[in-house]
């Protein structure tokens, strides 16, 4: 990932010599370059960052698609992730942003959970209630991803605070993976990124609120960023 002032750029190299390149723009910020999303606009935006421009100066477009693709708002959320006789995988029920690359892991956690439901409750009278519980957990997980991503977008132009806030995601991932390795914990019952843990959810909300307060009121940016870092580490102990 390359962090820019109002966006971030991904470069994903595949093993056949093709690299996927894209920009995710923060639409809540004033854009340095406005107008239609065509090749000239892309070149102008990339040209704002010399190191990025050098990386891309000799690239050629592959076919398909053979052209730049543009999408409007990417976030989506269904009101219901499961019902009495059906269920969506998490990535189908909602999508926030690719910043933390949560899509595959989140989907696999849903596959595992649904497989256990089908194995143990296929003919159970409780299946509807259990699927409702699945829905509620998926909504909690998407809310957690949303909060973890949102704080990072708020600090795109403030790298020290971006680093500090990003620690929330890594702590959540490590906690989730450690829980899966614990033989005493049923792995399929654990919510992705600890989303069903009230204490963890309160910690994320507290740090996010502290971030917003600092961004609105700080006069000494570096002093405030250092203070915020210390508060994040203290909250994560």
State the predicted function of each range.
Residues 1-28, 81, 88-90:
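Active-site substrate-recognition segment that forms the wall
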Residues 6-8, 40, 84, 198, ...:
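Short, low-complexity intrinsically disordered segments
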Residues 26, 37-38, 49, 158, ...:
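Alpha-helix initiation/capping motif
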Residues 117-237:
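C-terminal helical "tail/cap" subdomain of flavin- and related membrane-associated enzymes
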